């Protein structure tokens, strides 16, 4: 995004720069929001399959999964900040992001200390997520205040649609987990030969549900995806030439 924004701004193409920023935020939301919901719903089976063996017990899996859920909540804001920060760098403003980072560091440290006592390791993870939203708020406010960029009503609608699709996907995955629990009683007692296919099935079910919902709500447009892929292909061909 940084070289694209720099090119548009140097050429005086303000609207093109705004459009590129909108697309970056939209694609960031399209990737991060569904991933957040999936990580929250599938945290327990993911940790159980990857790590529960040897001295890593079932209780350790549960505790780790809780931390993963707490971290996952902040994933969209992490991604959005990465999409918004280049807007400052493209204008030669490197001081503002540093100031924002200092504020976030202080907020993260303060919240970690405050939440660690009542909630333990989950409190520390939650503090990191909350601090990421503080960072996102700073960037949104700073960009709007300087007139660099502000999200449009259309972008807001798309993000709401993505959130809706993600929640439906999460609900379907959760129902699938309930079905597995009803059928097999206890996930922790299953062998890996059964767990892995069931987990893969839940993932496929989630992806299929999101794609169907995204198509119905107009979130995914095949022509836009093809244009993006073709433009990347042309750029790669030019670099190789």
Task: List where the protein language model places each region.
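Hydrophobic residues within alpha-helical transmembrane segments
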Residues: 30, 70-73, 99-107, 130, ...
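Membrane-interface helix-loop junctions in multi-pass transport and translocation proteins
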Residues: 95, 104-137, 178-204
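Short alpha-helical transmembrane segments in multi-pass integral membrane proteins
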Residues: 20, 26-41, 118-147, 163
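Membrane-proximal transmembrane or re-entrant/amphipathic helices at the cytosolic face
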Residues: 150-151, 175-241
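Interfacial segments at transmembrane-helix termini and the short loops linking adjacent helices
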Residues: 40-74, 148, 185-190
